[in-house]
Amino acid sequence: MADGVDHIDIYADVGEEFNQEAEYGGHDQIDLYDDVISPSANNGDAPEDRDYMDTLPPTVGDDVGKGAAPNVVYTYTGKRIALYIGNLTRWTTDEDLTEAVHSLGVNDILEIKFFENRANGQSKGFALVGVGSEASSKKLMDLLPKRELHGQNPVVTPCNKQFLSQFEMQSRKTTQSGQMSGEGKAGPPGGSSRAAFPQGGRGRGRFPGAVPGGDRFPGPTGPGGPPPPFPAGQTPPRPPLGPPGPPGPPGPPPPGQVLPPPLAGPPNRGDRPPPPVLFPGQPFGQPPLGPLPPGPPPPVPGYGPPPGPPPPQQGPPPPPGPFPPRPPGPLGPPLTLAPPPHLPGPPPGAPPPAPHVNPAFFPPPTNSGMPTSDSRGPPPTDPYGRPPPYDRGDYGPPGREMDTARTPLSEAEFEEIMNRNRAISSSAISRAVSDASVGDYGSAIETLVTAISLIKQSKVSADDRCKVLISSLQDCLHGIESKSYGSGSRRRERSRERDHSRSREKSRRHKSRSRDRHDDYYRERSRERERHRDRDRDRDRERDREREYRHR
């Protein structure tokens, strides 16, 4: 009897399995997800998801279509259709996604899985959502892209490997662009909107009701904590393209929170999420279409990110400005600047103080996301509530305004000046080496000194890359100078050697000549002696002959 019951159970499960396969029809994506996508997301293209995927509870219907009878009684054994929902912010939680799906009339959500980076626990910006009917999947694909989640329109695609790879590539590009902007060290600083996705955390995706506790926001935040999200009807500005700079002033906490001191450590994880940002490809300044989604409390009236391009993580931060308080809805009146929360300033509606900086010190705004005080021109108000400074006129040393006037350079201008400095450095070094090789050390030294002076006078001379160029030019200059000094001493040594050799040759010639003269003299004297002897012999013979003749 027990065997019969076992057979009945086994056949019932197999029948369910065949019925499910027949119901799926063209939707083999579920098997593809179960057998291919999940291992590849854990062990293949995205190994960073492994820890999080392993900690998830077993999903409903994971063993469907795997050819093995389930040993657990599931509460749902019917049809399951999986979809990818992408183009999400990194702090979008499963509760936000669930509420957005429920608002469309879809109530048969079976599971939600967020893909996360293993290194830092941040969301990759897309999730896997399983629903229980074809009608729900069609409704999600048709209506969810028209809704807005944290200022971005989700993208709904079928669950297959092609769309998975597309979302993975998009996540990698976004991460790389955020690291290139210098945002890998801290979360979004308060009072300024971030260029790309902040490194602050996001609530991890969970099954509805599976993991107890509130939202979790892993990852450190910026100095002073992240600011609250933008009010309804306003989206964050477009990322800037300038060089990395220090973070701006800290933002305000939500109501009821104690304001941390500036440059404080990371706040409580889970009390405040980072602000939403603009997803790449969304038009700049486009207001959201729907009301503010549920989440953290709205921002304190009178505070918020500035309307102009936000500052990067180096350079002087521009003054942050608030959004005027207004209920959720369409975009309100124009934005005005006001002081940050940690500094005194006039209340909203009070007449603004005089500008604290001469507008002539600010360059005209550019379209490249310059971190100037405002992209529309000089600041209309004093962001820190200080009185106008004493006018020095044309006397005395320049103040901090001259330094700030040199730093606001767009990325295009910075790269142009750096390329020009590199060209000056390389051409000066090559010309100096060629001049030094032919012995023209004066021209080589003059070329290098001129190049060093030009690079030091450029606007980016304080940059480390410019300092490297200057040090290489100085090293080349020192080498050529030492070579020129060594060549001068060698020339003097050669001249001395030539003089010595000439004197030696002269002395040798003189000695040889004196010896020759001496020899000639002795030869002449010997010849004269021989002549005298010959004459004496001749005289003696003549005398002998005369004597003989007389005797006869």
UniProtKB/Swiss-Prot annotation:
Task: State the residue spans of region: Necessary for interaction with NUDT21/CPSF5.
Answer: 81-161
Q: Where is this region: Sufficient for nuclear targeting?
A: 511-552
- Region (Necessary for interaction with NXF1), start-end ranges: 1-213
Q: Where is the composition biased (Low complexity)?
A: 207-219
Q: Name one GO molecular function term.
A: ribosomal large subunit binding
Renumbered to this chain, the Basic and acidic residues biased-composition regions fall at 389-404, 494-504, 516-552
Q: What is this protein called?
A: Cleavage and polyadenylation specificity factor subunit 6
Region (Disordered): which ranges? 169-411, 479-552
Annotated ranges, domain RRM: 81-161
Q: What is the lineage of its organism?
A: Eukaryota, Metazoa, Chordata, Craniata, Vertebrata
Q: Where does this protein have compositionally biased stretches of type Pro residues?
A: 220-265, 285-366, 377-388
Q: Name the GO cellular-component terms.
A: cytoplasm; interchromatin granule; mRNA cleavage factor complex; nuclear speck; nucleoplasm; nucleus; paraspeckles; perichromatin fibrils
Assembly information from the UniProt record: Component of the cleavage factor Im (CFIm) complex which is a heterotetramer composed of two subunits of NUDT21/CPSF5 and two subunits of CPSF6 or CPSF7 or a heterodimer of CPSF6 and CPSF7. The cleavage factor Im (CFIm) complex associates with the CPSF and CSTF complexes to promote the assembly of the core mRNA 3'-processing machinery. Associates with the exon junction complex (EJC). Associates with the 80S ribosome particle. Interacts (via the RRM domain) with NUDT21/CPSF5; this interaction is direct and enhances binding to RNA.
